[in-house]
């Protein structure tokens, strides 16, 4: 993640609303500690709230329609490093733990954040850009750009400003198809010490000590002595050496495993709201989002067409590791809500000529 001193950065989405003042992680021994972003701060006694999704507003931070006061929150990156609140940016995907959500008379929801975990999907060199298709390729993974993808200050031209060889950090969602949908892309203009890839393990070869994430071949031979529990179908966060081995495989320097893509809090009774893709589907009443089992049997009106590959927002309560839903909505990039930012703060000056 690129450090920064102020927020928000110049915006690259289609509109801005300005308002006036008003774990599921399984650790590999010897491969580091902590969760991917983490969910500390929600008690195991069944109190508090948890939400996971892109930052869509400031004035504190707005995630999934909830305004979280982040003044006292602990902010960490998915590698466990402490971050400043000023490092948070629009489009970054975060896991937020905090107090119970309250709803004002005008319908606005708010809570106090205790921890904010930031997680990106890919960090590495761009090997291809397809402007016509709206995609780029990073570490062998195809990344889809949408009209709502946010680009950082160094990429104000959007996808047209991205060049082959540039090292970028991609925030967003892994789709069941293996393609990544980008909610934000940062240009890593400072030298990096490693690359990073998050995805689902496949093609595990324990003899060769390799596996794949998408099309990328990863070798864990250098850290094999500390690796245990690796299996196909697991979610993995892999830090990679900057150069591949002689066979072309990317060399892992650390691996972190999880059963889900989102580091959900432990305990029952926590109110949770998550955004992601349906990764498994049994029926309208039972499916998984980012590996998290959802029980939607009590939802009065479900959107038609629920299926693997649909992006949804689910709100409910955690019980026995299952998210018992009380609402399920599609979350598509052509929704009007996704075309807007929300900024709240004190107006310090007004330019009549600029309007």
Regions of interest found by a model, annotated:
Residues 2-70, 78-355:
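Short, flexible, surface-exposed loop segments at domain boundaries
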């Amino acid at each position: 993640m690129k450090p920064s001193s102020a927020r928000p950065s110049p915006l690259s989405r289609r509109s801005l609303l300005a308002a006036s003042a008003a774990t599921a992680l399984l650790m590999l021994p010897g491969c580091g500690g902590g969760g991917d972003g983490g969910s500390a701060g929600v008690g195991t006694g069944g109190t508090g709230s948890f939400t996971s999704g892109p930052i869509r507003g400031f004035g504190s931070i707005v995630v999934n329609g909830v305004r979280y006061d982040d003044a006292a929150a602990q902010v960490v990156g998915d590698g466990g490093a402490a971050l400043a609140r000023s490092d948070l940016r629009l489009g970054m995907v975060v896991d937020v733990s905090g107090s119970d959500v309250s709803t004002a008379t005008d319908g606005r929801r708010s809570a106090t954040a205790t921890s904010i975990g930031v997680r990106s999907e890919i960090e590495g060199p761009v090997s291809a850009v397809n402007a016509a298709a709206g995609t780029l390729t990073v570490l062998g993974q195809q990344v889809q750009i949408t009209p709502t993808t946010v680009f950082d200050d160094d990429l104000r031209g959007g996808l047209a400003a991205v060049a082959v060889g540039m090292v970028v950090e991609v925030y967003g969602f892994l789709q069941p198809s293996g393609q990544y949908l980008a909610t934000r892309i940062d240009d890593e203009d400072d030298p990096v010490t490693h690359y990073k890839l998050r995805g689902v393990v496949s093609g595990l070869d324990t003899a060769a000590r390799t596996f794949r994430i998408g099309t990328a071949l990863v070798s864990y031979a250098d850290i094999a002595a500390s690796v245990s529990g690796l299996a196909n179908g697991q979610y993995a966060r892999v830090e990679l050496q900057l150069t591949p081995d002689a066979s072309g495989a990317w060399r892992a320097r650390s691996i972190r495993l999880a059963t889900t893509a989102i580091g959900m809090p432990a305990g029952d009774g926590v109110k949770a709201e998550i955004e992601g893709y349906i990764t498994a589907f049994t029926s309208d009443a039972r499916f998984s989002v980012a590996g998290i089992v959802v029980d939607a049997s009590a939802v009065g009106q479900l959107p038609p067409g629920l299926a693997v590959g649909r992006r949804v927002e689910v709100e409910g309560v955690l019980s026995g590791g299952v998210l018992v839903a009380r609402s399920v909505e599609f979350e598509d990039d052509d929704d009007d809500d996704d075309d807007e930012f929300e900024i709240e703060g004190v107006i310090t000056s007004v330019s009549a000529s600029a309007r």
